[in-house]
Amino acid sequence: MSDDEIVCILDTRNNQKEKDRQITREVNNLIIEQENTQNRVIAPSPQLMVAIRQSVEQRQEYIRRMSIDIQRMLIPYGEDVYLISDMMLLKEEVVQHIDFQFLKNKVVPPPPVFYSSTIYFLYKQATCQRMGPIYLQQLGNVVTLRIKENYPAIKTISDYPSLKSIIEFYSRFEMGNGPDFFVKKEESQRQFEVVLGEAFQYINLFHKKHGTPPAPPQFLIKFCILMHQLGFQEWTAESFDVIVVDRLRRNLRNIDQRFFDSIRDAFGIYLKRF
């Protein structure tokens, strides 16, 4: 090997070392900037709200695209990737709800009402599309296990209701206009108030913890669509805006008001499908 070749190799190695050092410096600067950002209280700006919304949408789209790749691995005649992604979204909403309540009250609360109503909504979706509720039957066990893993020191954590018990409860509302219609309508109204209260707490506590509102709570939208399907509330985009969105807006004045527009818009998209 000639002297020129040796010099060339040494120069290449030195250049590579300098590039590595530059990369290391840039990474360290990013870490420092991230830590400084986390230590600052950031006021939600319009640009931040848009960025958060886009980030949530991109994440949901990524999950759906990734799910398509595993479709061939799923049990035949079971739920498709779209319903499974809805199940995973419900699991995350439940886990976050539990975390917020634990931070506030220092106890793990029982299963929220919106868990059962969303499960029944997804069950109706599955059976309507002739998909056997296979994975849906296991979701309660998955959620229970996740919560127990998050709180290993808590010994009294309620098991989540089975799909069978949820179907038995909500199938009573499928009977249509009978002598007990008004009794069931009152019960559906009570459930609505509970789920709306759970949505209020979810949004409020999420905002307090993160400084920004969450993505529109899907469990609230799906509950309202479910009651619409069962005939207990003839929702329109306008009535949803007045009865649901305005109530949240009035009680959560510290949250960017465009967040509530996103809830209304998300509901409108769902409503067109049913």
UniProtKB/Swiss-Prot annotation:
Highest taxon of source: Eukaryota
Protein name in UniProt: Uncharacterized protein C16C10.9
Organism encoding this protein: Caenorhabditis elegans
- Lineage of the organism: Eukaryota, Metazoa, Ecdysozoa, Nematoda, Chromadorea
